[in-house]
């Protein structure tokens, strides 16, 4: 079978080594004669998976000891509700940075539980879309926390600055950039991320929460979303998505074997630079994001003639370059370059783009 490179924004490409290992032990995991999907989540064998996964993740991200690591369900959208209901306490307001589609989605959900103080940070630089630097964010006073999304997958907008807002509790949706580069977890009160981009398959949600923020939950909060309940039960308040957890654990071990997050950062910068350079040097393709805010994970681009979009997608798919269609909100194309996408795949995409431009430009 010809090599296929999956540029989907999620569920995304998984490391080939991880898939091969899962295939090898699918029906006879650790000599038990059963699949890991079939064993109890409270068995000694699966508890070892859970503990090993957490330890590997803590090592990869250098998670401080005063943070809890939770493996949850419901995706990032569940966290849009869980965050205000866990963190507001007696407060009624929180600051929400609006930088794109997913930040706006979090705001819309938060309106059910609090009065979000919306701070629009989008701007333009030389007709290119951009994000204002953090020093220009006009935060309110008295908000329970500040929420933002460091990477907008649809718009290809990234906020690479680390927050430095004193005692302000900072909450961030790292769904699309978690584990793609080193991160100072201590700058945040809560980090959450859906698994289906850089962690593992869909079904698992990662939450990293500072311990002093536990115990503030609304009495109306469902127990399954209560960080304190999940922490007290080691993320097993109910039956977790065990297979997704197991596969995520394999991804963590793969990341460590590759050299950790510093190596991932190096690879991801190389991949993104190659694709952006190809777009910028071409008369046929364009990207409308200012260089300072270009996402390394999600690269949207448009063809000079949108009438060629369908043909581009048809031919790229036939060439083994899958899931390049842009989000329905913005159209065009999008290549997601998560950790498991190799430089070889981006080079194949670039070669195809140049050939397509020569034939149709």
UniProtKB/Swiss-Prot annotation:
**Amino-acid positions noted as binding L-glutamate in the UniProt annotation, renumbered to this chain:** 9, 42
Primary place of residence?
A: cytoplasm
Q: Please state where this protein is localized.
A: Cytoplasm
The EC number on file is 2.6.1.52
Q: Show the SUPFAM superfamilies listed in the entry.
A: PLP-dependent transferases (SSF53383)
What GO terms are given for molecular function? O-phospho-L-serine:2-oxoglutarate aminotransferase activity; pyridoxal phosphate binding
Q: Which Pfam families match?
A: Aminotran_5
Q: What does the record's cofactor remark say about binding?
A: Binds 1 pyridoxal phosphate per subunit.
Instruction: Give the UniProt keywords, A-Z.
Output: Amino-acid biosynthesis, Aminotransferase, Cytoplasm, Pyridoxal phosphate, Pyridoxine biosynthesis, Serine biosynthesis, Transferase
* GO terms for cellular component: cytoplasm
Q: Which domain of life is it from?
A: Bacteria
What EC class is this? transferase
Residues modified to N6-(pyridoxal phosphate)lysine: 197
Q: Which InterPro entries match?
A: Aminotrans_V_dom (IPR000192), Aminotrans_V_PyrdxlP_BS (IPR020578), Pser_aminoTfrase (IPR022278), PyrdxlP-dep_Trfase (IPR015424), PyrdxlP-dep_Trfase_major (IPR015421), PyrdxlP-dep_Trfase_small (IPR015422)
The reaction(s) annotated as catalysed by this protein in its Swiss-Prot or TrEMBL entry are: O-phospho-L-serine + 2-oxoglutarate = 3-phosphooxypyruvate + L-glutamate; 4-(phosphooxy)-L-threonine + 2-oxoglutarate = (R)-3-hydroxy-2-oxo-4-phosphooxybutanoate + L-glutamate
Q: Which PROSITE patterns match?
A: AA_TRANSFER_CLASS_5
What's an example Gene Ontology biological process for this entry? Answer: pyridoxine biosynthetic process
- Pathway where it operates: Amino-acid biosynthesis; L-serine biosynthesis; L-serine from 3-phospho-D-glycerate: step 2/3; Cofactor biosynthesis; pyridoxine 5'-phosphate biosynthesis; pyridoxine 5'-phosphate from D-erythrose 4-phosphate: step 3/5
Q: Required co-factor?
A: pyridoxal 5'-phosphate
- Describe the family membership recorded for this protein in Swiss-Prot or TrEMBL: Belongs to the class-V pyridoxal-phosphate-dependent aminotransferase family. SerC subfamily.
Subunit comment = Homodimer.
Its biological purpose is as follows: Catalyzes the reversible conversion of 3-phosphohydroxypyruvate to phosphoserine and of 3-hydroxy-2-oxo-4-phosphonooxybutanoate to phosphohydroxythreonine.
Could you identify this protein by its name? Phosphoserine aminotransferase
Organism of origin is Sodalis glossinidius (strain morsitans)
């Amino acid at each position: 079978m010809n090599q296929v490179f999956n540029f989907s924004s999620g569920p995304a490409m998984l490391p080939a080594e991880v898939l091969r290992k899962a295939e090898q032990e699918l029906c006879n995991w650790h000599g038990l004669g059963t699949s890991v999907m079939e064993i109890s989540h409270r068995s000694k064998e699966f508890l070892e998976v859970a503990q090993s996964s957490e330890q590997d993740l803590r090592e990869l991200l250098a998670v401080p000891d005063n943070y809890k690591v939770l493996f949850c369900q419901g995706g990032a959208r569940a966290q849009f509700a869980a965050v205000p209901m866990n963190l507001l306490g007696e407060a009624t307001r929180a600051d929400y940075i609006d930088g794109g589609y997913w930040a706006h989605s979090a705001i819309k959900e938060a309106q059910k539980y609090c009065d979000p103080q919306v701070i629009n940070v989008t701007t333009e630089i030389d007709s290119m879309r951009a994000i204002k630097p953090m020093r220009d964010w006009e935060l309110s006073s008295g908000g329970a926390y500040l929420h933002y999304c460091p990477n907008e997958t649809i718009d290809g907008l990234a906020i690479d600055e680390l927050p430095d807002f004193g005692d302000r509790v900072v909450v961030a949706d790292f769904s699309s950039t978690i584990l793609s580069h080193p991160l100072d977890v201590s700058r945040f009160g809560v980090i959450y991320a859906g698994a289906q981009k850089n962690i593992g398959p869909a079904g698992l949600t990662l939450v990293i929460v500072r311990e002093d923020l536990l115990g503030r939950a609304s009495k109306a909060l469902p127990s399954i979303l209560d960080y304190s309940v999940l922490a007290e039960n080691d993320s097993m308040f109910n039956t977790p998505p065990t297979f997704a957890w197991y596969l995520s654990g394999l991804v963590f071990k793969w990341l460590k074997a590759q050299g950790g997050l510093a190596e991932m950062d190096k690879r991801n910068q190389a991949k993104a630079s190659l694709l952006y350079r190809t777009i910028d040097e071409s008369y046929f393709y364009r990207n409308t994001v200012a260089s300072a805010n270009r996402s390394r994970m999600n690269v949207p681009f448009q063809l000079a003639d949108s009438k060629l979009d369908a043909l581009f997608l048809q031919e790229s798919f036939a060439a083994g370059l899958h899931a390049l269609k842009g989000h329905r909100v913005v159209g065009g194309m999008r290549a997601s370059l998560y950790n498991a996408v190799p430089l070889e795949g981006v080079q194949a995409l670039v070669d195809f783009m140049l050939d397509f431009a020569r034939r149709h430009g």
